[in-house]
A protein has these predicted regions:
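Short, cationic-aromatic polyanion-contact patches
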Residues: 54, 89-99
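A short, conserved structural fragment
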Residues: 79-89
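Surface-exposed polar/charged interaction patches
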Residues: 31-34, 63, 81
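Long, low-complexity, charged/polar intrinsically disordered regions in eukaryotic proteins
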Residues: 1-36
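Short amphipathic alpha-helical interaction segments
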Residues: 65-77
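Eukaryotic partner-binding/assembly regions in large regulatory complexes
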Residues: 1-4, 42-46, 66, 88
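Short acidic, hydrophobic short linear motifs in intrinsically disordered regions
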Residues: 40-59
Length: 99
């Protein structure tokens, strides 16, 4: 019975995290456009635009009124679901996933 309740808890946690996918991708898209515009204004290649995981997590925590831990879990879950590119301490939207 203990493992059953643990499975339910994990399932609920996954559902909670996945419910943030769409709003998180919107936030990421907005941050990405701002970064691209900044690079464009400075004359650099906008293909180099990326958002730090920390900035993305903090923005989600502020906008969605969630804690940093949950925001980090959302970032990791998005990467595991192959909805964002995660490299080093940076993330960026996958091409064609959310436009």
């Amino acid at each position: 019975m203990n493992s059953f309740t643990q499975q339910i808890k994990v399932s609920r946690q996954q559902s909670e995290i996945q419910s943030f996918y769409e709003p998180a991708l919107r936030v990421l898209g907005h941050l990405f456009e701002v970064k691209k515009q900044n690079l464009r204004n400075k004359g650099y290649d906008e293909n180099n635009a990326a958002i730090t995981r920390e900035e993305f997590s903090q923005t989600m925590a502020q906008r969605f009124r969630i804690n940093q831990w949950l925001a980090g879990q959302i970032v990791n879950s998005l990467a595991n679901a192959d909805l964002v590119q995660k490299f080093g301490g940076y993330v960026k939207p996958k091409v064609g996933v959310h436009e």
